[in-house]
């Protein structure tokens, strides 16, 4: 999506994001989000999540990490971890490439490893 605080237009989504959001195709994703990345984030978390992302980037990092509840096309929410990387694209200018991971899946597949990290 565009790395612009005022215009976070979604430019591309892979099949995994379509699956996580419950969308059949890119057009459906763009329609329910209004083409905006922030509209994937639960409304009461949007401001704090955006502030966190930009604070990390403005602090000199090219990667950002955040946790939020992602709104699916059916109106339900899932807990996700977001790992974004800001880059300069020849065709689209400054953009974020983002990997969004379902927290429950991570816990199910890596639970033991995650517990070891905490010790």
What are these regions (language model features)?
Residues 1-10:
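Short acidic/glycine-rich beta-turn/loop cap or linker motifs at sensory/regulatory domain boundaries
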Residues 3, 68-75, 88:
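PAS-family sensory domains
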Residues 8, 15, 63-65:
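Short coil/loop residues immediately preceding or within conserved phosphate-binding loops
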Residues 11, 18-39, 46-50:
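PAS and related sensory helical modules
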Residues 38-67:
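Terminal output helix/cap of sensory domains in signal transduction proteins
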Residues 64-66, 73-82, 96:
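PAS and PAS-like sensory/regulatory domains
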Residues 82-98, 102-108:
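Short loop/turn elements at sensory-signaling interfaces that couple input to output
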Residues 107-119:
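Sensory-domain boundary/capping and coupling elements
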């Amino acid at each position: 999506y565009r790395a612009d605080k005022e215009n976070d237009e979604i430019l591309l989504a892979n099949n995994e994001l379509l699956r996580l959001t419950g969308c059949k195709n890119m057009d459906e994703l763009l329609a329910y989000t209004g083409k905006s990345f922030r509209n994937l984030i639960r409304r009461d978390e949007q401001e704090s999540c955006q502030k966190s992302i930009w604070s990390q980037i403005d602090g000199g990092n090219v990667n950002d990490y955040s946790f939020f509840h992602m709104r699916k096309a059916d109106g339900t929410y899932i807990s996700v971890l977001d790992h974004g990387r800001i880059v300069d694209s020849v065709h689209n200018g400054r953009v974020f490439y983002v990997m969004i991971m379902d927290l429950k899946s991570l816990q199910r597949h890596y639970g033991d490893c995650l517990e070891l990290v905490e010790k």
